[in-house]
Amino acid sequence: LKAKEIIYMLVDAVSKNGNLLLNVGPRADGSIQEEQKKPLLETGKWLKINGEAIYETTYWEKQEAETEKGQQVRFTKKGNQLYAVILDEELDASVVIKDLEIPSGATVTLLGEAGELSWEQKGENLSVKIPENIQKQYAYTLKISC
């Protein structure tokens, strides 16, 4: 499996109150083969940035959605925080998540990037402006604080 596939499976499972079990076959000396180690290390790098959307979270009332562009989105929550993980390596300057309404006083941030993001409610859809030159990731997490 590639890191992208592991991340997408993990996010999908957690958004549905599940977990992910990976079978990694070590060598006789306990070391892990390079072709298995590399995707695990890349997944770990992604989790360093986006782990708060995974660890100690639970499912939300809506498990999945998509953007107007057709990108898949998965949701998790922790307390007053809602996490929307966009399962795509590319983000446009504006991301519109269909059928997602948030309270008017909410703040939206992108994990791994500094500062709040501009957003507006367009009917039942949430439109979020994405900053330029963001760090490349396999998936991006919007943190919505209500």
Residue ranges with predicted function:
Residues 1-146:
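Mature catalytic domains of secreted/periplasmic carbohydrate-active enzymes
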